[in-house]
Amino acid sequence: MIAPGRLNVHGALNPNGKFVVYWMTSARRAHWNHALEHAVDLANQHRQPLIVIECLALNHRWANDRISTFVLQGMIDNRAAFAQTGVTYIPYVETAKKEASGLLEVWLQQATACVIDDFPTYYPRHVLETALQFNTCELHVVDSNGFMAMRAQGRNFTTAYSLRRHLHKTILEHMYEFPLANPLDNAKDLPMIEATLIEDIFAKSNTPLTPYEYLWRVAEGGDIGKNALSKLNIDHTVPPVLTKKGGSVEARRRWKEFLSKRLINYNEMRNQPQERGASGISPWLHFGHIGVHQIINEIFTAYRWDVSMVTPPNDGRRNGWWGLPEPVEAFLDQIITWRDIGFIHCAMIPDHTEFSSLPQWAQTTLAEHSTDERPYVYTLEQFEEAQTHDPLWNAAQQQLRQEGIIHNYLRMLWGKKILEWSPDPQTAMRWMIALNDRWALDGRDPNSYTGIGWVLGKFDRGWTEREVFGKIRCMTSASTMRKFKTKAYIEKYSQGQTQQTVLGSGPSLYTAHQ
Protein backbone atom coordinates (compact mmCIF):
# COMPACT_ATOMS: atom_id res chain seq x y z
CA MET A 1 0.00 0.00 0.00
CA ILE A 2 1.48 3.33 -1.05
CA ALA A 3 1.86 6.31 1.29
CA PRO A 4 -1.15 8.68 1.28
CA GLY A 5 1.10 11.61 0.42
CA ARG A 6 1.86 10.05 -2.96
CA LEU A 7 -1.78 9.58 -3.98
CA ASN A 8 -4.56 11.93 -5.02
CA VAL A 9 -7.93 10.48 -6.05
CA HIS A 10 -10.39 12.34 -8.28
CA GLY A 11 -13.89 11.48 -9.46
CA ALA A 12 -15.93 8.37 -8.77
CA LEU A 13 -15.73 4.71 -9.73
CA ASN A 14 -17.37 3.78 -13.00
CA PRO A 15 -19.97 1.11 -12.03
CA ASN A 16 -19.94 -0.21 -15.60
CA GLY A 17 -16.16 -0.36 -15.86
CA LYS A 18 -14.58 -3.53 -17.18
CA PHE A 19 -10.96 -3.14 -16.04
CA VAL A 20 -8.38 -0.99 -14.28
CA VAL A 21 -5.98 0.89 -16.55
CA TYR A 22 -2.57 2.33 -15.66
CA TRP A 23 -1.66 5.15 -18.05
CA MET A 24 2.14 5.08 -17.81
CA THR A 25 3.59 8.50 -18.72
CA SER A 26 6.75 8.99 -16.66
CA ALA A 27 7.48 6.00 -14.39
CA ARG A 28 8.19 3.79 -17.40
CA ARG A 29 9.26 0.65 -15.56
CA ALA A 30 7.91 -2.60 -14.14
CA HIS A 31 9.91 -2.48 -10.89
CA TRP A 32 10.07 -0.13 -7.89
CA ASN A 33 7.04 1.77 -9.19
CA HIS A 34 4.48 3.22 -6.75
CA ALA A 35 1.91 3.74 -9.51
CA LEU A 36 2.15 0.20 -10.85
CA GLU A 37 1.97 -1.22 -7.33
CA HIS A 38 -1.16 0.82 -6.66
CA ALA A 39 -2.70 -0.24 -9.98
CA VAL A 40 -2.15 -3.91 -9.13
CA ASP A 41 -3.77 -3.35 -5.73
CA LEU A 42 -6.80 -1.71 -7.35
CA ALA A 43 -7.19 -4.49 -9.90
CA ASN A 44 -7.06 -7.10 -7.14
CA GLN A 45 -9.54 -5.10 -5.08
CA HIS A 46 -12.04 -4.97 -7.95
CA ARG A 47 -11.13 -8.43 -9.26
CA GLN A 48 -10.70 -7.00 -12.73
CA PRO A 49 -8.02 -7.13 -15.43
CA LEU A 50 -5.19 -4.61 -15.30
CA ILE A 51 -4.05 -2.98 -18.52
CA VAL A 52 -0.87 -0.90 -18.65
CA ILE A 53 -0.67 1.50 -21.59
CA GLU A 54 2.60 3.23 -22.41
CA CYS A 55 2.43 5.79 -25.20
CA LEU A 56 4.92 7.69 -27.28
CA ALA A 57 3.15 10.87 -28.36
CA LEU A 58 4.27 13.18 -31.14
CA ASN A 59 2.14 16.14 -30.13
CA HIS A 60 4.77 17.93 -28.07
CA ARG A 61 7.29 20.59 -29.01
CA TRP A 62 10.51 18.59 -28.83
CA ALA A 63 9.44 15.27 -30.36
CA ASN A 64 12.53 13.99 -32.19
CA ASP A 65 14.48 10.87 -33.12
CA ARG A 66 16.61 11.00 -29.98
CA ILE A 67 13.74 11.02 -27.51
CA SER A 68 11.63 8.58 -29.53
CA THR A 69 14.37 5.98 -29.83
CA PHE A 70 15.15 6.07 -26.12
CA VAL A 71 11.48 5.65 -25.16
CA LEU A 72 10.86 2.81 -27.63
CA GLN A 73 13.91 0.93 -26.37
CA GLY A 74 12.33 1.14 -22.93
CA MET A 75 9.10 -0.27 -24.35
CA ILE A 76 10.99 -3.34 -25.59
CA ASP A 77 12.22 -3.99 -22.03
CA ASN A 78 8.78 -3.37 -20.55
CA ARG A 79 7.12 -5.74 -23.01
CA ALA A 80 9.44 -8.49 -21.80
CA ALA A 81 8.96 -7.55 -18.13
CA PHE A 82 5.16 -7.71 -18.34
CA ALA A 83 5.03 -10.97 -20.32
CA GLN A 84 3.41 -13.87 -18.43
CA THR A 85 2.57 -11.70 -15.40
CA GLY A 86 -1.22 -11.45 -15.41
CA VAL A 87 -1.05 -7.84 -16.62
CA THR A 88 -1.72 -6.78 -20.20
CA TYR A 89 0.90 -4.32 -21.45
CA ILE A 90 0.13 -2.23 -24.54
CA PRO A 91 2.90 -0.08 -26.04
CA TYR A 92 1.55 2.51 -28.43
CA VAL A 93 3.43 4.80 -30.84
CA GLU A 94 1.60 7.72 -32.41
CA THR A 95 2.48 7.82 -36.11
CA ALA A 96 0.85 11.18 -36.88
CA LYS A 97 0.29 14.18 -34.63
CA LYS A 98 -3.04 14.01 -32.76
CA GLU A 99 -3.66 10.52 -34.16
CA ALA A 100 -4.35 9.26 -30.63
CA SER A 101 -6.14 12.37 -29.37
CA GLY A 102 -9.21 10.32 -28.43
CA LEU A 103 -7.48 7.21 -27.11
CA LEU A 104 -7.19 8.21 -23.44
CA GLU A 105 -10.82 9.31 -23.26
CA VAL A 106 -12.17 6.07 -24.73
CA TRP A 107 -10.10 3.93 -22.36
CA LEU A 108 -11.29 5.96 -19.37
CA GLN A 109 -14.91 5.63 -20.48
CA GLN A 110 -14.70 1.85 -20.11
CA ALA A 111 -12.43 1.68 -17.05
CA THR A 112 -13.54 1.25 -13.46
CA ALA A 113 -10.55 3.30 -12.39
CA CYS A 114 -7.43 4.75 -13.97
CA VAL A 115 -4.01 5.16 -12.39
CA ILE A 116 -1.79 7.83 -13.93
CA ASP A 117 1.68 9.15 -13.14
CA ASP A 118 2.02 12.48 -11.34
CA PHE A 119 4.87 14.29 -13.13
CA PRO A 120 4.98 18.05 -12.53
CA THR A 121 6.16 19.36 -15.87
CA TYR A 122 6.22 19.16 -19.66
CA TYR A 123 4.08 16.65 -21.61
CA PRO A 124 3.24 14.18 -18.80
CA ARG A 125 1.68 17.08 -16.91
CA HIS A 126 -0.39 17.91 -19.99
CA VAL A 127 -1.63 14.30 -20.23
CA LEU A 128 -2.61 14.35 -16.55
CA GLU A 129 -4.46 17.65 -16.94
CA THR A 130 -6.30 16.18 -19.94
CA ALA A 131 -7.29 13.06 -18.00
CA LEU A 132 -8.67 15.18 -15.15
CA GLN A 133 -11.11 16.83 -17.57
CA PHE A 134 -12.92 13.64 -18.57
CA ASN A 135 -14.43 12.64 -15.20
CA THR A 136 -15.67 9.28 -16.51
CA CYS A 137 -14.00 7.04 -13.92
CA GLU A 138 -12.07 7.29 -10.70
CA LEU A 139 -8.63 8.78 -11.42
CA HIS A 140 -5.74 7.87 -9.10
CA VAL A 141 -2.78 10.23 -9.52
CA VAL A 142 0.39 8.67 -8.12
CA ASP A 143 3.81 10.21 -7.45
CA SER A 144 6.62 7.71 -8.14
CA ASN A 145 9.31 10.35 -8.62
CA GLY A 146 11.54 11.10 -5.66
CA PHE A 147 12.63 9.87 -2.26
CA MET A 148 10.20 12.37 -0.75
CA ALA A 149 6.64 12.73 -2.04
CA MET A 150 6.76 16.03 -3.89
CA ARG A 151 3.33 17.37 -2.86
CA ALA A 152 3.29 15.98 0.68
CA GLN A 153 5.95 18.28 2.13
CA GLY A 154 3.50 21.17 2.11
CA ARG A 155 5.98 23.80 0.97
CA ASN A 156 8.50 24.87 -1.61
CA PHE A 157 12.15 24.80 -0.54
CA THR A 158 14.20 27.81 -1.62
CA THR A 159 17.61 26.38 -0.69
CA ALA A 160 19.23 22.96 -0.47
CA TYR A 161 20.07 23.81 3.14
CA SER A 162 16.38 24.13 4.07
CA LEU A 163 15.51 20.85 2.36
CA ARG A 164 18.37 19.02 4.09
CA ARG A 165 17.14 20.22 7.48
CA HIS A 166 13.65 19.00 6.64
CA LEU A 167 14.96 15.64 5.40
CA HIS A 168 17.17 15.16 8.47
CA LYS A 169 14.18 15.78 10.72
CA THR A 170 11.71 13.58 8.79
CA ILE A 171 13.99 10.81 7.47
CA LEU A 172 12.21 8.05 9.40
CA GLU A 173 8.80 8.65 7.81
CA HIS A 174 10.32 8.50 4.32
CA MET A 175 11.82 5.09 5.06
CA TYR A 176 8.28 3.68 5.10
CA GLU A 177 7.54 4.92 1.56
CA PHE A 178 9.62 2.47 -0.46
CA PRO A 179 7.59 0.71 -3.17
CA LEU A 180 7.75 -3.02 -3.81
CA ALA A 181 10.71 -4.13 -5.88
CA ASN A 182 8.48 -6.47 -7.90
CA PRO A 183 4.86 -5.27 -7.81
CA LEU A 184 3.88 -7.69 -10.59
CA ASP A 185 4.32 -10.60 -8.17
CA ASN A 186 0.90 -9.65 -6.81
CA ALA A 187 -0.73 -9.67 -10.26
CA LYS A 188 -0.47 -13.38 -11.04
CA ASP A 189 -4.11 -14.17 -10.23
CA LEU A 190 -5.68 -11.24 -12.05
CA PRO A 191 -8.19 -12.06 -14.80
CA MET A 192 -7.06 -11.26 -18.34
CA ILE A 193 -8.81 -8.84 -20.66
CA GLU A 194 -10.25 -10.17 -23.91
CA ALA A 195 -8.20 -9.23 -26.97
CA THR A 196 -11.36 -8.24 -28.83
CA LEU A 197 -12.14 -5.57 -26.23
CA ILE A 198 -8.71 -4.00 -26.74
CA GLU A 199 -9.23 -4.00 -30.50
CA ASP A 200 -12.69 -2.46 -30.10
CA ILE A 201 -11.40 0.38 -27.91
CA PHE A 202 -8.63 1.26 -30.35
CA ALA A 203 -11.09 1.09 -33.23
CA LYS A 204 -13.59 3.31 -31.44
CA SER A 205 -10.93 6.00 -31.04
CA ASN A 206 -9.75 5.56 -34.65
CA THR A 207 -6.29 4.65 -33.37
CA PRO A 208 -4.19 1.85 -34.89
CA LEU A 209 -2.42 -0.63 -32.64
CA THR A 210 1.38 -0.56 -32.79
CA PRO A 211 2.98 -3.79 -34.03
CA TYR A 212 5.89 -5.15 -32.00
CA GLU A 213 7.98 -5.34 -35.16
CA TYR A 214 7.94 -1.54 -35.39
CA LEU A 215 9.20 -1.14 -31.82
CA TRP A 216 11.99 -3.58 -32.56
CA ARG A 217 13.07 -1.76 -35.72
CA VAL A 218 13.32 1.63 -33.99
CA ALA A 219 15.13 0.11 -31.02
CA GLU A 220 17.75 -1.45 -33.29
CA GLY A 221 19.18 1.95 -34.18
CA GLY A 222 21.47 2.39 -37.17
CA ASP A 223 19.89 2.42 -40.62
CA ILE A 224 17.06 0.13 -39.49
CA GLY A 225 15.99 2.53 -36.76
CA LYS A 226 16.51 5.58 -38.93
CA ASN A 227 14.23 4.22 -41.64
CA ALA A 228 11.53 3.30 -39.11
CA LEU A 229 11.63 6.75 -37.52
CA SER A 230 11.43 8.48 -40.90
CA LYS A 231 7.71 7.65 -40.99
CA LEU A 232 7.03 9.75 -37.89
CA ASN A 233 6.21 13.45 -38.13
CA ILE A 234 8.98 14.54 -35.76
CA ASP A 235 12.29 16.42 -35.80
CA HIS A 236 14.75 14.12 -37.58
CA THR A 237 17.69 16.52 -37.16
CA VAL A 238 18.25 15.44 -33.53
CA PRO A 239 19.57 11.90 -33.95
CA PRO A 240 19.63 9.01 -31.47
CA VAL A 241 22.69 8.62 -29.28
CA LEU A 242 23.80 5.13 -30.15
CA THR A 243 26.05 4.83 -27.11
CA LYS A 244 23.06 5.31 -24.78
CA LYS A 245 20.38 2.68 -25.03
CA GLY A 246 17.08 3.35 -23.31
CA GLY A 247 15.27 0.90 -21.08
CA SER A 248 15.35 -0.66 -17.64
CA VAL A 249 17.88 -3.35 -18.54
CA GLU A 250 20.51 -0.83 -19.57
CA ALA A 251 19.59 1.45 -16.66
CA ARG A 252 20.23 -1.31 -14.13
CA ARG A 253 23.47 -2.34 -15.85
CA ARG A 254 24.85 1.19 -15.73
CA TRP A 255 23.70 1.77 -12.16
CA LYS A 256 25.22 -1.46 -10.85
CA GLU A 257 28.50 -0.73 -12.63
CA PHE A 258 28.66 2.70 -10.96
CA LEU A 259 27.69 1.31 -7.55
CA SER A 260 30.33 -1.42 -7.62
CA LYS A 261 33.21 0.46 -9.25
CA ARG A 262 32.92 4.25 -9.11
CA LEU A 263 30.70 5.35 -6.24
CA ILE A 264 33.55 5.05 -3.75
CA ASN A 265 35.45 7.82 -5.58
CA TYR A 266 32.44 9.96 -6.41
CA ASN A 267 33.28 12.97 -4.26
CA GLU A 268 36.78 13.27 -5.73
CA MET A 269 36.07 12.44 -9.38
CA ARG A 270 32.57 13.73 -10.21
CA ASN A 271 33.72 17.22 -11.24
CA GLN A 272 36.64 16.04 -13.39
CA PRO A 273 35.55 16.39 -17.04
CA GLN A 274 37.98 13.78 -18.34
CA GLU A 275 36.92 11.13 -15.83
CA ARG A 276 33.80 8.96 -15.57
CA GLY A 277 33.25 10.11 -12.02
CA ALA A 278 29.52 10.80 -12.21
CA SER A 279 26.88 8.09 -12.36
CA GLY A 280 25.64 9.14 -15.81
CA ILE A 281 22.17 7.70 -15.16
CA SER A 282 20.16 10.93 -15.43
CA PRO A 283 18.62 10.01 -18.84
CA TRP A 284 17.25 6.75 -17.43
CA LEU A 285 15.99 8.49 -14.30
CA HIS A 286 14.26 11.11 -16.42
CA PHE A 287 12.37 8.57 -18.51
CA GLY A 288 11.54 6.49 -15.44
CA HIS A 289 13.50 3.47 -16.63
CA ILE A 290 14.99 3.21 -13.16
CA GLY A 291 13.54 4.49 -9.90
CA VAL A 292 15.32 6.45 -7.22
CA HIS A 293 14.10 4.05 -4.50
CA GLN A 294 15.90 1.14 -6.13
CA ILE A 295 19.11 3.17 -6.23
CA ILE A 296 18.83 4.27 -2.61
CA ASN A 297 17.83 0.80 -1.40
CA GLU A 298 20.85 -0.78 -3.07
CA ILE A 299 23.16 1.82 -1.54
CA PHE A 300 21.70 1.20 1.91
CA THR A 301 22.02 -2.56 1.40
CA ALA A 302 25.59 -2.38 0.11
CA TYR A 303 26.70 -0.26 3.08
CA ARG A 304 24.45 -1.99 5.65
CA TRP A 305 22.82 1.30 6.53
CA ASP A 306 19.74 1.82 8.69
CA VAL A 307 18.10 4.92 10.06
CA SER A 308 19.71 4.49 13.49
CA MET A 309 22.99 5.62 11.90
CA VAL A 310 21.68 9.17 11.33
CA THR A 311 23.60 11.57 13.57
CA PRO A 312 22.74 15.01 15.01
CA PRO A 313 22.76 17.96 14.91
CA ASN A 314 20.08 18.84 12.37
CA ASP A 315 21.98 21.78 10.90
CA GLY A 316 21.44 21.39 7.16
CA ARG A 317 24.98 20.27 6.40
CA ARG A 318 25.71 18.43 3.17
CA ASN A 319 27.41 15.40 4.68
CA GLY A 320 28.37 13.88 7.99
CA TRP A 321 24.87 13.04 9.22
CA TRP A 322 24.12 9.87 7.25
CA GLY A 323 26.86 7.90 8.98
CA LEU A 324 28.22 6.75 5.61
CA PRO A 325 31.52 7.26 3.74
CA GLU A 326 31.96 10.75 2.30
CA PRO A 327 31.57 9.79 -1.39
CA VAL A 328 28.35 7.91 -0.64
CA GLU A 329 26.93 10.86 1.28
CA ALA A 330 27.91 13.18 -1.57
CA PHE A 331 25.98 11.01 -4.02
CA LEU A 332 22.95 10.79 -1.71
CA ASP A 333 22.94 14.58 -1.53
CA GLN A 334 22.63 14.70 -5.31
CA ILE A 335 20.10 11.88 -5.76
CA ILE A 336 17.91 13.04 -2.86
CA THR A 337 18.48 16.70 -1.96
CA TRP A 338 19.05 18.20 -5.38
CA ARG A 339 16.74 15.86 -7.25
CA ASP A 340 13.86 16.20 -4.80
CA ILE A 341 14.18 19.97 -4.51
CA GLY A 342 13.58 20.12 -8.26
CA PHE A 343 10.46 17.95 -8.19
CA ILE A 344 9.02 19.69 -5.14
CA HIS A 345 9.66 23.11 -6.67
CA CYS A 346 8.01 22.23 -9.98
CA ALA A 347 5.02 20.69 -8.19
CA MET A 348 4.56 23.75 -5.98
CA ILE A 349 5.36 26.40 -8.63
CA PRO A 350 3.34 25.70 -11.81
CA ASP A 351 5.07 28.46 -13.81
CA HIS A 352 8.55 27.12 -12.99
CA THR A 353 9.84 27.66 -16.54
CA GLU A 354 9.02 31.37 -16.45
CA PHE A 355 11.44 34.17 -15.55
CA SER A 356 8.91 35.30 -12.93
CA SER A 357 9.56 32.09 -10.95
CA LEU A 358 13.05 33.32 -10.01
CA PRO A 359 13.58 34.75 -6.51
CA GLN A 360 12.72 38.44 -6.34
CA TRP A 361 16.31 39.41 -5.49
CA ALA A 362 17.53 37.61 -8.61
CA GLN A 363 14.93 39.26 -10.85
CA THR A 364 15.85 42.65 -9.40
CA THR A 365 19.61 42.36 -9.82
CA LEU A 366 19.33 40.93 -13.33
CA ALA A 367 16.98 43.77 -14.29
CA GLU A 368 19.41 46.34 -12.92
CA HIS A 369 22.18 44.91 -15.11
CA SER A 370 20.11 43.97 -18.16
CA THR A 371 21.53 46.87 -20.19
CA ASP A 372 25.17 46.26 -19.23
CA GLU A 373 27.43 45.83 -22.21
CA ARG A 374 28.05 42.14 -22.86
CA PRO A 375 31.60 41.03 -23.73
CA TYR A 376 30.09 38.91 -26.53
CA VAL A 377 26.55 38.57 -27.84
CA TYR A 378 25.55 35.45 -29.77
CA THR A 379 22.38 34.32 -31.49
CA LEU A 380 20.50 31.15 -30.57
CA GLU A 381 21.78 29.55 -33.77
CA GLN A 382 25.39 30.34 -32.87
CA PHE A 383 24.92 28.82 -29.43
CA GLU A 384 23.24 25.74 -30.88
CA GLU A 385 26.01 25.20 -33.43
CA ALA A 386 28.74 25.72 -30.78
CA GLN A 387 30.10 28.75 -32.63
CA THR A 388 31.41 30.89 -29.79
CA HIS A 389 34.93 32.16 -29.10
CA ASP A 390 35.28 29.82 -26.09
CA PRO A 391 36.66 26.30 -26.83
CA LEU A 392 35.51 24.90 -23.47
CA TRP A 393 31.96 26.16 -23.88
CA ASN A 394 31.87 24.89 -27.46
CA ALA A 395 33.01 21.47 -26.25
CA ALA A 396 30.21 21.35 -23.66
CA GLN A 397 27.64 22.23 -26.32
CA GLN A 398 29.09 19.60 -28.66
CA GLN A 399 28.82 17.01 -25.90
CA LEU A 400 25.15 17.95 -25.52
CA ARG A 401 24.57 17.57 -29.26
CA GLN A 402 26.52 14.34 -29.59
CA GLU A 403 25.73 12.50 -26.33
CA GLY A 404 22.54 14.10 -25.05
CA ILE A 405 24.18 15.18 -21.78
CA ILE A 406 26.74 17.67 -20.49
CA HIS A 407 29.26 16.86 -17.79
CA ASN A 408 27.81 17.88 -14.40
CA TYR A 409 30.13 20.77 -13.55
CA LEU A 410 30.38 22.03 -17.10
CA ARG A 411 26.60 22.18 -17.42
CA MET A 412 26.65 24.94 -14.80
CA LEU A 413 29.37 26.80 -16.72
CA TRP A 414 27.42 26.25 -19.95
CA GLY A 415 24.42 28.04 -18.47
CA LYS A 416 26.39 30.87 -16.88
CA LYS A 417 28.01 31.73 -20.20
CA ILE A 418 24.66 31.75 -22.02
CA LEU A 419 23.48 34.24 -19.40
CA GLU A 420 26.57 36.39 -19.97
CA TRP A 421 26.51 36.25 -23.81
CA SER A 422 22.77 36.61 -24.49
CA PRO A 423 21.05 39.94 -25.25
CA ASP A 424 19.22 39.92 -21.90
CA PRO A 425 18.51 37.50 -19.00
CA GLN A 426 14.97 36.65 -20.12
CA THR A 427 16.26 35.60 -23.52
CA ALA A 428 19.07 33.65 -21.87
CA MET A 429 16.56 31.62 -19.85
CA ARG A 430 14.42 30.86 -22.90
CA TRP A 431 17.46 29.80 -24.92
CA MET A 432 18.85 27.56 -22.18
CA ILE A 433 15.52 25.79 -21.90
CA ALA A 434 15.18 25.42 -25.67
CA LEU A 435 18.70 24.04 -26.17
CA ASN A 436 18.44 21.64 -23.27
CA ASP A 437 14.90 20.47 -24.02
CA ARG A 438 15.77 19.80 -27.64
CA TRP A 439 19.13 18.03 -27.29
CA ALA A 440 19.34 16.57 -23.78
CA LEU A 441 18.15 13.06 -23.05
CA ASP A 442 17.51 14.27 -19.50
CA GLY A 443 15.86 17.51 -20.61
CA ARG A 444 12.18 18.45 -20.15
CA ASP A 445 12.66 17.45 -16.52
CA PRO A 446 12.15 19.20 -13.16
CA ASN A 447 15.88 19.03 -12.55
CA SER A 448 16.61 20.55 -15.94
CA TYR A 449 14.38 23.51 -15.23
CA THR A 450 15.62 24.02 -11.68
CA GLY A 451 19.22 23.64 -12.87
CA ILE A 452 18.64 26.43 -15.37
CA GLY A 453 16.91 28.37 -12.62
CA TRP A 454 20.02 27.92 -10.44
CA VAL A 455 22.11 29.57 -13.16
CA LEU A 456 19.85 32.62 -12.68
CA GLY A 457 19.87 32.61 -8.86
CA LYS A 458 17.28 30.01 -7.88
CA PHE A 459 18.26 28.04 -4.71
CA ASP A 460 21.30 30.33 -4.36
CA ARG A 461 22.21 33.58 -2.58
CA GLY A 462 23.57 36.91 -3.70
CA TRP A 463 27.29 37.24 -4.46
CA THR A 464 29.64 40.13 -5.11
CA GLU A 465 28.02 42.44 -7.64
CA ARG A 466 29.56 42.65 -11.10
CA GLU A 467 28.74 43.63 -14.66
CA VAL A 468 26.02 41.64 -16.48
CA PHE A 469 25.59 39.12 -13.62
CA GLY A 470 24.70 41.61 -10.93
CA LYS A 471 24.63 39.61 -7.69
CA ILE A 472 24.15 36.28 -9.50
CA ARG A 473 26.97 33.80 -8.95
CA CYS A 474 29.54 34.04 -11.75
CA MET A 475 31.57 31.21 -13.30
CA THR A 476 34.34 31.53 -15.88
CA SER A 477 36.00 29.15 -18.30
CA ALA A 478 39.42 30.37 -17.17
CA SER A 479 38.81 29.42 -13.53
CA THR A 480 37.33 26.08 -14.61
CA MET A 481 40.41 25.30 -16.70
CA ARG A 482 42.63 26.12 -13.72
CA LYS A 483 40.62 23.82 -11.44
CA PHE A 484 40.27 20.84 -13.76
CA LYS A 485 42.11 19.17 -16.60
CA THR A 486 40.03 20.16 -19.59
CA LYS A 487 42.40 19.71 -22.55
CA ALA A 488 41.35 16.14 -23.30
CA TYR A 489 37.69 17.08 -22.92
CA ILE A 490 38.01 19.93 -25.40
CA GLU A 491 39.84 17.71 -27.87
CA LYS A 492 37.25 14.95 -27.55
CA TYR A 493 34.34 17.22 -28.34
CA SER A 494 36.05 19.40 -30.92
CA GLN A 495 34.02 20.56 -33.89
CA GLY A 496 35.65 18.23 -36.38
CA GLN A 497 35.02 14.99 -34.49
CA THR A 498 33.36 12.23 -36.48
CA GLN A 499 29.61 12.01 -35.93
CA GLN A 500 29.04 8.38 -36.93
CA THR A 501 27.94 7.22 -33.49
CA VAL A 502 25.46 10.08 -33.35
CA LEU A 503 23.92 10.27 -36.79
CA GLY A 504 22.75 6.68 -36.91
CA SER A 505 24.65 5.78 -40.07
CA GLY A 506 25.96 2.29 -40.53
CA PRO A 507 25.01 -0.86 -38.63
CA SER A 508 23.40 -0.89 -35.22
CA LEU A 509 25.72 -0.42 -32.26
CA TYR A 510 23.18 -1.86 -29.82
CA THR A 511 23.71 -5.52 -30.56
CA ALA A 512 26.81 -5.68 -28.40
CA HIS A 513 24.86 -4.52 -25.35
CA GLN A 514 22.12 -7.14 -25.56
What do the PLM-derived regions correspond to, one by one?
Residues 1-190, 398, 417-427, 431-451, ...:
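Trp/Phe/Arg-rich N-terminal binding region typifying the photolyase-homology
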Residues 120, 145, 167, 259, ...:
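A broadly conserved detector of short glycine/acidic/proline-rich loop/turn motifs that flank catalytic sites
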Residues 16, 149, 156-357, 488-514:
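Glycine/tryptophan-enriched, flexible segments
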Residues 4-13, 46, 67-74, 237-239, ...:
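Short low-complexity stretches enriched in small and charged residues
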Residues 73, 137, 193, 246, ...:
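Short coil/turn linker and secondary-structure boundary residues
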Residues 272-490, 494-496:
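Active-site-proximal binding-pocket segments
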Residues 19-34, 51-59, 203, 242-251, ...:
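Short charge-dense sequence patches
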